[in-house]
């Protein structure tokens, strides 16, 4: 196991940005302190004999400083959408920054993804990790209360990428942290992901309106294009979903326990990724808005060249009383976990 840290660049403010590279098992993960973003994940393939980077991303700090597609970043205070960019809590209405039409997406104008996180690497018996910390002041992007976030990303000897999200607050506030990594198990720059085979441990999903805000209705997946209970190519029912997949699925089992969430298989490389989460939902996004994005080593990413599996609380939960509560505060700390296991 090994951890290295190097300077990734300098922001216009003069602050240094670091790039950490973790090695454990047969995986190698790189993460930058700007946006606590995953920049690279190298995974071997017995079938091809190659070790490929399976994450979309950028070669330079400038790519992450102007990252409009949220590539690889840690998202907060509230991942996904809040309808109308507002919510009411304890008799008071809070207005948020509108950055998705009439709605607030991924925390607002900058959220946590364009901020510089405090970072520290450490090693334990079974793995190597980086802990990122961030303080969000009262009123940040319109959200109430002071929040201290602590996110750990690491690799284990068992070829697992492990994730730990924590937040403490001095006042009640919606919280929903996730990572917005774009995967392509064939290797970044190797074309679209529509032939990847996906299975979701989800018997239902959240119905959404035309602007992707949940209606409040939880719909069984059986007999719909959203049925991934058995592994199938992403493209099989793709044409029946206008614009592609960008939907939250309700993960089977008890929220709060680490349980299977998703499995993805890519035939050319023979790679499989299994995802586990403690959260109630997972957003499956099929890269519908990747448009001529300049990526690594001269690659140009296009529509559907990567997919996201964003473990999270339900979108618009602050406005949907029937959804699991995403309000945390002094008497309820936020703490969620995820795990990505790789096989080849």
What are these regions (language model features)?
Residues 1-344:
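An exposed, glycine/acidic-rich loop-and-rim segment of catalytic or binding clefts
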């Amino acid at each position: 196991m090994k951890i290295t840290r190097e300077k990734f660049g300098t922001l216009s403010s003069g602050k240094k940005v670091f790039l950490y590279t973790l090695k454990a098992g047969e995986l190698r993960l790189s993460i930058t302190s700007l946006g606590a973003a995953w920049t690279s994940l190298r995974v071997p393939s017995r079938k091809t004999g190659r070790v490929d980077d399976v994450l979309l991303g950028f070669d330079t700090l400038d790519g992450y400083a102007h990252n409009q597609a949220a590539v690889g970043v840690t998202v907060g205070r509230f991942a996904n959408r809040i309808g109308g960019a507002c919510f009411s809590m304890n008799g008071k209405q809070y207005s948020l920054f509108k950055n998705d039409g009439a709605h607030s997406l991924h925390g607002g104008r900058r959220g946590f993804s364009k901020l510089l996180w405090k970072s520290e690497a450490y090693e334990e018996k079974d793995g190597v990790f980086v802990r990122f910390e961030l303080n969000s002041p009262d009123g940040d992007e319109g959200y109430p209360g002071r929040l201290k976030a602590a996110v750990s990303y690491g690799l284990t000897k068992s070829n697992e990428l492990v994730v730990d999200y924590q937040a403490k607050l001095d006042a009640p506030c919606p919280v929903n942290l996730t990572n917005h990594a774009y995967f392509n198990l064939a290797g970044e720059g190797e074309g679209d992901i529509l032939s990847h085979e996906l299975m979701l441990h989800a018997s239902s999903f959240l119905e959404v309106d035309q602007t992707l805000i949940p209606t409040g209705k939880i719909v069984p997946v059986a007999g719909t294009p959203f049925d991934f209970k058995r592994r199938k190519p992403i493209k099989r029912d793709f044409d029946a979903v206008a614009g592609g997949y960008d939907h939250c699925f309700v993960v089977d089992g008890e929220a709060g326990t680490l349980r299977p969430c998703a499995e993805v298989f890519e035939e050319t490389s023979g790679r499989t990724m299994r995802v586990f989460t403690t959260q109630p939902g997972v957003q499956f996004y099929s890269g519908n808005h990747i448009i001529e994005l300049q990526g690594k080593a001269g690659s140009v990413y296009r529509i559907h060249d990567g997919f996201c599996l964003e473990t999270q609380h339900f979108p618009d939960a602050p406005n949907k009383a029937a959804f699991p509560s995403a309000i945390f505060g002094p008497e309820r700390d936020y703490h969620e976990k995820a795990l990505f296991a790789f096989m080849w």
